[in-house]
């Protein structure tokens, strides 16, 4: 997989399509000739707000698109191996709260010696009362134990975590409860949608 500007442009085009499509919901309702309904106005404002947020996110993460080493140097460490149709997850444990310019998790695709940033991600212990991004869609990740090499063992409590991964022997890193996830496919086109948890276009990289 060769990183190219065309992939970035295509991803941004699909992001814009997703944003415009979301903003078009309810646009057919009119309160009178030539007058948009309140629903249309609200959708338009939401679309504009999302475009602005995504622009901030892209500006902040462009340095990581093909530079995993920089991400590591800036505190992102591996927390999963390749999750099919998703990617390798790298987390910066020092990033707290929601700031679109500072995603705590970067999701990479890998082939050969090349790494491509596909998505950025946030996790929550419960679904946010107010979506942090307009139109946000959520996924889920079950409770489990993470190990230093990115391997993962499902476990309902930290006490149930083996001290080392049963298969790789890697040392225990951390445990987390059931989580609500928010993916944003900012750097790789995703026909399933900007906020989809998985991406069929990265299936080719499921085996690294």
Residue ranges and their predicted role:
Residues 2-11:
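Bacterial N-terminal signal peptides that target proteins for export
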Residues 22-25, 38:
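Intrinsically disordered, low-complexity regions of eukaryotic proteins
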Residues 32-208:
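Primary mode marks residue(s) on the alpha4-beta5-alpha5 output face of response regulator receiver
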Residues 24-33:
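Sec-dependent signal peptide cleavage junction
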Residues 11-23:
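Bacterial N-terminal signal peptides
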């Amino acid at each position: 997989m060769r990183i190219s500007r065309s992939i970035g442009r295509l991803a941004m085009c699909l992001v814009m399509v997703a944003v415009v499509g979301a903003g078009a919901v309810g646009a057919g309702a009119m309160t009178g000739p030539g007058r948009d309904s309140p629903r249309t106005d609200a959708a338009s404002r939401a679309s504009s707000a999302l475009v602005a947020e995504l622009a901030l996110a892209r500006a902040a993460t462009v340095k990581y698109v093909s530079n995993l080493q920089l991400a590591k140097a800036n505190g992102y460490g591996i927390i999963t191996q390749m999750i099919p149709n998703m990617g390798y997850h790298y987390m910066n444990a020092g990033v707290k709260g929601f700031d679109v310019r500072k995603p705590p998790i970067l999701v990479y695709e890998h082939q050969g010696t090349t790494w491509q940033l596909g998505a950025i991600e946030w996790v929550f212990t419960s679904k946010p009362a107010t979506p942090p991004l307009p139109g946000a869609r959520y996924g889920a990740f079950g409770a489990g134990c993470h190990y230093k090499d990115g391997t993962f063992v499902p476990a309902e409590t930290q006490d149930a975590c083996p001290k080392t991964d049963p298969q790789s022997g890697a040392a225990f890193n951390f445990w987390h409860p059931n989580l609500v996830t928010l993916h944003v496919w900012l750097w790789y086109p995703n026909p399933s949608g900007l906020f989809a948890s998985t991406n069929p276009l990265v299936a080719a990289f499921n085996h690294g």
